[in-house]
């Protein structure tokens, strides 16, 4: 029997110190990504902790976090770099007096343009470059965590643009050439499944799916965020949520909604769930009016069942 420490458990413990409760698959994916130098594609429904995972990793490792929020129409000028046009214009005005004699002495248009060539490199040099999140991440001297959030909201052209960055930790700027990472960043891409991602992108990534948690895992997550929550109330909350997720709803409550609801119940000095209290606070869990209406008949039975099961003291379903 091996006496070697479990590296996966060590990753989960490290994330736990930041308040992020990681399942073994999450810790395993992170451990492999760190040692294989591969990005992680994190998929799953909204609100299960995909974005928060990047923040937790950065906090645990003591690294800066660079976040690129994807959206329709995103291109490399917004994601990689842009030129400081105001500074370029200012320098143009300052150098105007020096440029004028060169142009005045030129015998024609072609010689004048040739005389200006020496200045063009100046205006498209490092001092006029404004790094955006992707380039800023490559330039971090100690490395960083790079979050490319909601990649499914971008288009296929931007996805193709990312391939060089993900495979080689490098990007190409026409005026400056290829820029490689000082220290390769740990890259996480998140997707809510709005569209199918390309195979080329998937091949370059480790895949991690974060789904809705079991009651036992959700209780650990809520307790980490609300250390003072009464244990019996916590058990009732996660059991009620599990029952609510079994209903045929358009949008099931995620972990973020559970935490918000638990925080509200603590604020209201709740000791146990009641049907009336659940109805009054249901809008913290369900965000569609159709779901709120559809859930009404089940609220009282679910609240009573959660209270009864919580009071038995039996282990929560894992």
Summary of predicted features, one role per range:
Residues 1-318:
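C-terminal regulatory/interaction module of P-loop NTP-utilizing enzymes
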